[in-house]
């Protein structure tokens, strides 16, 4: 085998000269691609390395091509990188689905099966390089081996390339299959043989901190963040890509004294949440776009009756069924404006796995304090990624609802003269606190009313909550880059990872990322944009929903809209091309 120069890792983690390595594995259903990604991420975490794993798969229930992209480094990572340092591909034909997800640089290492004669796609960027050929099904002389030869050999060669030991791999396997030790015993001999005989170039060495770190998905972080914030009741209906929120809570919420119900549909799920919250219990549901559509009328009920309710929306691409396993940022309009009639709600966005816990605290704080629905917008890219993070020890106080205890706390449930954004909440069963909560317009006592003057005054009362929220959350933003940089980017949600690295590598840019989307932090935005030469909004939405939403709040005529449909997250390479391209129009109105 010819000698090749040691590959240079393709990406630098923000904050200095820290290096990271990007590995991709592509195969078909049954090849164990996802399992290998999970095992490698566990190995990184065991050493105190940081990392991030994203999966790419189709909407089919079983089978089809799948790929994982793993990036590991010695600092926190929330973007998978542009170029792959090591690609393991079981069949060239498996790569056809992953255009835009996997790209090689000039010194990448490519490993393929020795019997595969398929042609690599030009978009891969392989430049005609010769692949390292390995016998994924058999070893020297065609001798069959025990276990699953294909993925065990691939795992072994990746460990060799990274300089990771057999013991580390075995520890990760036993951790992953603690309930099936015999499975590990059956596969380890295969791994050891492959590890001893595999010949692959070494990648740059990465040294971890030595203290094991914690692996968590975005959905798991949302679930655990909600529990830490005081969640006691969850009702939901499974839907990709949010299902893991409920799956996590099924295992963990009852142990914390909470209750969970799998409802018959999304309408029922939010109805149960509103009912439980009416009973004084902090409650939440999680869904995706189609489910959010069904929940919208019930959102209006929560707002009209002034009942706290948390709705987590893990966005998928497209309307209707759309692309269930793909990401997009196209539910912003629905979250901010969806529903008949005028009713207030707050909307938050999730940046990454680490941020997800903080967002859930903020969501419960707003819901409990202001007694209204709060929507938390995640998406498939954040929800289903696996990210290595530091262990969490949360000592924050849980948000507490201001409860009514006696007439001294206010004469009526919906008093118009109270000095605070929301009236003290009357929990059913509190002596003297009986009232009617309904979706119909009502008087201060909760009695039905069709009086236009009452409707106007109650609407003003409900919407004053947004004024108070805007004042209390004006610092809920994150800015990246130099404060005096001449060029600006405005984005939200899962764009955070790529823009964090973009700002670190391009000092001419500053970035504005609101944690709260509605009400929008206009005061912070106005201060941030001063002195900018040019500004762009960047988002995964065909309509440019963020840009259009902001145009209704402030002058955006000089701000360029960079927007495309979702499906794939935006890379630094694509971002560079879009920012360099001539502007088609100054604004989208």
Per-region residue spans from a language model:
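Thiamine diphosphate
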Residues: 18-99, 240-337, 346-367
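Gly-rich Lys/Arg/Thr-decorated short loops/hinges at beta-loop-alpha junctions or inter-strand turns
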Residues: 177, 196-210, 226-231, 249-256, ...
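Active-site cofactor/cluster-binding pocket
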Residues: 2-229, 233-235
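A short, gly/pro- and small-residue-rich
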Residues: 97-117, 306, 546-563
């Amino acid at each position: 085998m010819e000698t090749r120069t040691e590959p240079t890792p393709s990406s630098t983690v923000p904050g200095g000269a820290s290096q990271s390595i990007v590995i991709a594995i592509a195969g078909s259903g049954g090849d164990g691609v996802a399992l290998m990604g999970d095992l490698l991420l566990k190995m990184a975490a065991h050493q105190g390395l940081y990392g991030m794993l994203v999966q790419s798969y189709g909407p089919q229930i079983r089978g089809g091509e799948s790929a994982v992209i793993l990036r590991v480094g010695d600092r926190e990572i929330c973007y998978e990188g542009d170029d792959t340092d090591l690609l393991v591909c079981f069949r060239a034909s498996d790569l056809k689905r992953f255009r835009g997800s996997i790209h090689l640089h000039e010194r990448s290492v490519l490993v393929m099966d020795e019997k595969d004669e398929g042609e690599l796609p030009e978009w891969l960027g392989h430049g005609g390089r010769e692949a390292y050929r390995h016998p994924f099904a058999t070893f020297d002389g065609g001798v069959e081996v025990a276990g699953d030869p294909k993925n065990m050999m691939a795992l072994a060669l990746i460990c060799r390339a990274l300089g990771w030991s057999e013991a580390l791999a075995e520890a990760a396997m036993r951790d992953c299959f603690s309930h099936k030790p015999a499975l590990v015993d059956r596969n380890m001999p295969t791994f050891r043989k492959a590890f001893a005989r595999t010949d692959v170039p070494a990648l740059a060495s990465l040294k971890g901190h030595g203290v094991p770190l914690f692996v968590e998905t975005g959905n798991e972080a949302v679930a655990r963040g909600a529990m830490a914030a005081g969640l006691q009741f969850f009702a939901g209906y499974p839907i990709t890509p949010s299902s893991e929120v409920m799956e996590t809570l099924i295992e963990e919420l009852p142990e914390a004294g909470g209750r969970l119900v799998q409802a018959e549909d999304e309408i029922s799920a939010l109805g149960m949440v509103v009912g439980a919250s009416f009973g004084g219990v902090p409650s939440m549901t999680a869904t995706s776009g189609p489910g959010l559509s069904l929940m919208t009328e019930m959102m209006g009920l929560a707002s009209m009756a002034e009942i706290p309710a948390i709705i987590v929306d893990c966005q998928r691409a497209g309307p209707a069924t759309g692309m269930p396993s793909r990401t997009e940022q196209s539910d912003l309009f629905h979250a901010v404006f969806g529903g008949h009639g005028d009713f207030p709600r707050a909307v938050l966005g999730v940046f990454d796995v680490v941020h997800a816990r903080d967002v859930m605290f903020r969501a419960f704080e707003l819901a409990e304090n202001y007694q209204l629905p709060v929507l938390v917008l995640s998406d498939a890219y954040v929800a289903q990624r696996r990210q290595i993070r530091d262990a969490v020890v949360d000592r924050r106080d849980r948000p507490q609802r201001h409860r009514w205890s006696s007439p001294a706390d206010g004469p009526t449930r919906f008093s118009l003269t109270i000095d605070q954004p929301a009236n003290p909440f009357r929990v059913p069963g509190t002596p003297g606190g009986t009232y009617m909560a309904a979706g119909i317009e009502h008087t201060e006592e909760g009695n039905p009313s069709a009086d236009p003057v009452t409707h106007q005054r109650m609407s003003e009362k409900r919407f004053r909550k947004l004024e108070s929220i805007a004042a209390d959350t004006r610092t809920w933003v994150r800015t990246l880059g130099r404060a005096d940089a001449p060029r600006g980017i405005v984005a939200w949600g899962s764009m955070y990872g790529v823009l964090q690295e973009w700002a670190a590598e391009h000092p001419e840019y500053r970035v504005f990322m609101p944690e709260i989307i509605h009400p929008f932090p206009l005061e912070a935005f106005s201060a941030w944009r001063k002195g900018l030469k040019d500004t762009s909004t960047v988002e995964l939405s065909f309509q440019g929903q963020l840009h259009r939403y902001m145009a209704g709040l402030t002058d955006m005529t000089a701000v360029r809209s960079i927007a495309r449909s979702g499906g794939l997250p935006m890379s630094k390479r694509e971002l560079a091309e879009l920012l360099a391209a001539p502007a088609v129009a100054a604004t989208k109105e």
